[in-house]
A protein has these predicted regions:
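N-terminal flexible segment immediately upstream of the FAD-binding catalytic core
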Residues: 1-63, 73-105, 134, 157, ...
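N-terminal glycine-rich flavin-associated loop
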Residues: 13, 36-68, 86, 90-135, ...
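A glycine-rich phosphate-binding loop feature that marks nucleotide/adenosyl-phosphate handling sites
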Residues: 27-30, 76-79, 135-142, 221-228, ...
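C-terminal substrate-binding/cap subdomain adjacent to the FAD-binding core in PCMH-type
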Residues: 36, 146, 154-385, 421, ...
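Flexible inter-domain linker/hinge segments
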Residues: 117, 189-233, 353, 513-586, ...
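Terminal amphipathic helices with adjacent charged low-complexity linkers/tails
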Residues: 258-265, 283, 291-400, 434, ...
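Ferredoxin-type iron-sulfur electron-transfer modules and their immediate structural context
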Residues: 395, 399-400, 475-480, 487-629, ...
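Iron-sulfur cluster-binding electron-transfer modules in prokaryotic oxidoreductases
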Residues: 514, 521, 528, 647-735, ...
Length: 995
């Protein structure tokens, strides 16, 4: 990691600016990358709390002769947001909506507000900002403006430029100017305004270059390369000087406030999923489909379909609307105000496909047809699938990845089929292939050839492919940059694309605004070579150090048994920076700090294992701080489209740190809980005094770091007893269906099952296990309670607490005991059922990763949560439970691991078996308790803040008669402490219904 250290600048910024100033190595490493393949270490980062603080920091940098890089979500794919500069991160604090004019359909915002967050605030007014880009959950308005972003529905709404009304900007000399509509003679611009001189010079340049602009600017809707000189052509009545800043990639000024044009919310829509047996046929059909005036036409190719089928969160969506094995899909959306008109257009789409000769019963290139999608929920799921396109493509686990550099070309629709065919041939010539998706409606398809940028031959191939592709685009009068901008990737090619004369004009614009290169130098003008490997994430000296890992990473390439490859799966797309919906990433949603998001942690890990953060970085205090607020919720395992499993990676970090530094007293008490619990339970009355004896809680905080503000779980003197099996009062006459097996085959059936009694329910909430036994026995099952195979008196344990503090060897020992105890039951075809999600789902995740044995894989294949097992039996018509009505409302919180393993739906399904029970799921992220995390004095504030994101307010709003349901022991504890309500396990709800 190349560094430029300026300690004097750091001291001055800290002394004179009230914002957060961070020049440490870990922070600079986290800001060294964006969603491109580049890595350039910044000088430092400033996170201003106000616009005035941002201006002050920029002024200091100007005085010190240091450039600045305004940054939003850092989701650029072309390298716009990396530079050897001081980063001005607008995304944490500069997020206010300044003005809303509902009648005028206008809004003014600060640059750091995220698009989805803005639209959430606008929704009650029936309005939205309609540039609906795929990264809307983390892209900021400032970043979108700097990039001139386009959305899937640009056929109707255009790009960002067409929706920006004005910009208040700080100029390079420190002055402020209002960029907006102006008269051609500048009569409405005061003589004293710094804008007047700039505008006069820009108009002169526009007049001089008008003919060249007319001749050289691409004639396609999607063109965001270079500066918008076409906005300066004289004789127009709609000159808006803000449009010269739009698409300027932060190279001309700093946007302080941005005024946007709004549109009415879309109403009900229809979607036609056009299937094609041949990719070229789909490309040729696009030009005909757009004549039906859809709002969007989006491509999904066979590669993306195949990859998405391997991702749990997308598999059900594909199964719902994809027929057969199409080579390509075109998703055609109609959104007129009149519903009947949408249906008529959908009918015309069917007629068009028929007229083009496509039919379901035909083979080859003429296979095809339209699947109607009218259900809004399925439409939303398809949109989620489509917007995750890049990340789905990046889920490939090989060293080669789809690389962004020719992904943004746009060509006229009549040339689209030829262009895609010829570019495919170019890829083949250079020994690779490409994956295609995105905006067929405007001829802007995102294609990324698969390359390994660690290899010199692939870097040479990248150069050759780029030159051939861009030459082809020029031949078709298209644009080499349709929506992702220039950055480092395409700035080098602006001269051949626009011609030398306009390239010089771009330099004149830059120099007029920013003569000393204060703002993001090297983008659009005077750019480096795009294949300069010294600026790559995987530079010429990139090498992962040898390391010993504890878990199985063999599905990935690289050092540490594949740990390197797993870490490198993070492509910095920033999906983990989402602020709402799903679970990922709860710590970031509280702190808004790049350190505390999955992307930031993955970057820190990558830099550490490759020696770029200095020796011993993996076990350093800085790395411990980086991992500190990760609650191991596993949301990233499911919701990160590239499958970055930070919870599992944290285990490796904890293990390495524990091996080097040992454990604190608090960590020992947490990790060894299963070992001392049998003895502690005998002193339950004494241990429980901690919460009632004056001063005891504060003493425990001082000695072991358990917060005095948090109650501790109550030990039970009468613990759950597993000395005898439970026979069903009415044994089932029929066996259950075949269970799963690790090899995919069927095992023998059994009406007997095994209950795993976890440490938490055994010693703190035995009523849950008692209720589960009652329910299962009443349903006709013979229940075996799992006991050690060697006859030991020490109960079984999944090893979860040991893993949480990095004691992997101890966890492996517990896992081996558990697998041995359950092996004979699994071999006899019995399901293994657990109540605590983090324990039983560990059977499917960490235990196979630790033991790497066939017995562990067989156990994983037959381990179920309590609700999963009952839901499966109910769906098959085999569940026999005489449930009585409960005419109440049940508010249900899903455990993070249930959501990560798609097990939460079973919770809702089982509760709905209770007659008259009204079941409602809480749309919540992590509860924030996360085992010991919520008890620790140094993390309790973040723990409670996570709960306040959605869970605790929802519980407080619930009526006193509402049943609060939560399967996780930590979740129940958080609800108790944070909302003063008692939550219960599903097993107790069902037992109540049986009473």
């Amino acid at each position: 990691m190349v560094e430029r250290l300026l300690p004097g600048l750091e001291r001055r910024l800290k002394a004179e600016s009230a914002g957060e100033v961070k020049f440490d190595r870990f922070t600079r490493g986290r800001y060294a990358t964006d969603a491109s393949h580049y890595q350039i270490t910044p000088i430092g980062a400033v996170i201003p709390r106000t616009i005035e603080e941002a201006e002050r920091a920029i002024g200091i940098c100007r005085a010190e002769g240091v450039s600045v890089l305004p940054r939003g979500g850092g989701s650029s794919q072309a390298g716009q947001t990396v530079n050897d500069s001081v980063v001005i991160d607008c995304s944490k604090y500069l997020t206010r909506v300044l003005e809303v004019d509902v009648a005028g359909r206008r809004v003014k915002v600060e640059p750091g507000i995220v698009l989805d967050e803005l639209n959430r605030q606008l929704k009650p007014h029936g309005l939205w900002f309609p540039v609906d880009i795929s990264t809307s959950s983390r892209a900021t308005i400032g970043g979108m403006t700097a990039n001139n972003s386009c959305g899937a529905r640009s056929l109707r709404y255009g790009n960002t430029r067409e929706n920006v009304l004005s910009i208040d900007a700080m100029l390079a000399d420190g002055s402020t100017a209002h960029f907006g509509p102006v008269a051609a003679d500048l009569s409405d611009v005061p003589e004293s305004s710094p804008l007047r001189g700039i505008a006069k010079d820009l108009f002169a340049l526009g007049a001089r270059e008008a003919d060249e602009v007319a001749a050289r600017f691409p004639k396609v809707q999607r063109r965001v390369g270079g500066y918008n000189l076409d906005a300066l052509i004289p004789g127009r009545n709609d000159i808006n000087l803000a449009h010269i800043l739009v698409g300027s990639e932060g190279t001309l000024a700093f946007s302080k406030a941005i005024e946007l044009k709004l549109s009415p919310l879309l109403g009900k829509r229809t979607v036609g999923a056009c299937h094609f047996g041949d990719f070229r046929a789909a490309m040729d059909a696009a030009q005909h489909i757009v004549k039906l005036a859809p709002i969007a036409v989006e491509l999904v190719d066979a590669t993306m379909i195949a990859l998405a089928r391997d991702i749990a969160m997308f598999r059900p969506t594909l199964e719902a609307f994809v027929r057969g094995q199409p080579a390509a899909l075109l998703l055609v959306e109609f959104a007129e105000a009149d519903w009947d008109e949408n249906l008529r257009r959908l009918k015309r789409l069917h007629e068009l496909m028929d007229g083009l000769g496509f039919a379901w019963d035909k083979g080859g290139a003429k296979f095809g047809g339209v699947v109607d999608v009218l259900d809004p929920k399925l439409q939303a799921a398809i949109t989620e699938l489509r917007t995750a396109g890049l990340n789905i493509m990046m889920s490939m686990k090989d060293a080669g990845k789809p690389i962004s550099f020719v992904e943004d070309c746009a060509v006229p629709l009549e040339h689209l089929a030829d262009y895609t065919s010829r570019l495919t041939d170019v890829f083949a010539k250079h020994g690779t292939s490409g994956t295609w998706y995105a905006h067929a409606s405007v001829g802007c398809l995102h294609v990324r050839p698969i390359l390994n940028l660690r290899l010199d031959k692939d870097i040479k191939a990248m150069r050759a492919i780029a030159e051939e592709a861009f030459a082809m685009v020029r031949e078709y009068k298209g644009s080499h940059s349709g929506e992702h901008g220039d950055g480092i990737v395409r700035s080098e090619f602006n001269a051949p694309m626009f011609g030398a004369r306009l390239a010089r004009a771009f330099e004149e614009v830059k120099d007029r605004f920013d003569p000393n290169g204060l703002f993001n130098p090297g983008k659009i003008t005077r750019a480096p070579r795009f294949d300069d490997r010294s600026k790559f994430r995987y530079g010429p000296n990139y090498h992962a150090q040898a390391m010993r890992t504890a878990l199985d990473w063999s599905a990935y390439p690289g050092a540490g048994g594949g740990f390197q490859g797993a870490v490198e799966m993070c492509n910095n797309n920033g999906a983990c920076r989402s602020l709402a919906g799903g679970v990922m990433c709860p710590s970031y949603r509280v702190t808004r700090d790049e350190r505390d998001v999955t992307r930031g942690r993955a970057n820190s890990l990558r830099l550490a294992i490759t020696g770029q953060l200095g020796p011993e970085a993996l076990t350093s205090d800085d790395m411990a701080e980086t991992m500190k607020l990760c609650v191991s919720c596993k949301a990233c395992r499911r919701e990160c489209p590239t499958g970055v499993d930070m919870a599992r990676m944290k285990i490796e970090v904890q293990a390495a740190r524990a091996a080097k530094h040992g454990l604190s007293l608090r960590d020992r008490l947490v990790g060894w809980l299963p070992r001392y619990a049998p003895y502690a339970a005998k002193m339950a009355w004494l241990l429980n005094l901690r919460d009632s004896l004056p001063g005891a809680a504060k003493l425990s905080e001082a000695v072991i770091g358990m917060s005095a503000r948090r109650s501790l779980p109550k030990w039970r003197g009468g613990v759950f007893c597993d000395s005898a099996d439970t026979a069903a009062p009415h044994p089932r006459p029929l066996p259950t269906a075949p269970l799963r097996s690790a090899g995919g085959g069927e095992q023998k059936t059994s009406a007997e099952i095994v209950l795993f009694a976890d440490t938490f329910n055994r010693y703190f909430e035995r009523e849950n296990l008692d209720a589960a036994l009652t329910v299962l026995a009443t349903a006709g099952y013979r229940v075996h309670v799992a006991k050690p195979a060697d006859g030991s008196a020490r109960p079984l344990c999944c090893g979860r607490t040991f893993l949480s503090v990095g004691q992997v060897e101890e966890a492996q020992g517990e896992a081996e005991r558990t697998v041995a105890a359950l092996a004979s039951f699994v071999a006899r075809g019995m399901a293994v059922i657990g109540l605590e999600p983090s324990c039983i789902l560990g059977f499917r995740d960490e235990i196979p990763a630790m033991l790497k044995s066939e017995a562990a894989r067989q156990l994983a294949a037959n381990a179920f949560t309590f609700e999963e097992f009952l839901a499966r039996e109910a769906s098959a018509g085999r569940l026999q439970l005489p449930l009585k009505k409960i005419a109440e409302r049940a508010l249900v919180h899903g455990h993070c691991h249930q959501k990560a393993f798609d097990a939460f739906g079973a919770v809702e399904q089982v509760l709905k078996l209770v007659p008259e029970l009204k079941v409602e799921a809480i749309e919540s992220s992590c509860c924030g308790m996360a085992g010991a995390f919520g008890f620790a004095s140094d993390t309790i504030d973040v723990s409670l803040a996570m709960g306040e994101l959605s869970l605790l307010p929802a519980v407080r709003k619930a009526g006193p008669d509402t049943i609060i349901v939560a399967d996780g022991t930590s979740c129940r504890h958080q609800i108790h402490d944070g909302a003063g309500r008692e939550a219960i396990h599903v097993a107790r709800v069902l037992a109540k219904s049986l009473a």
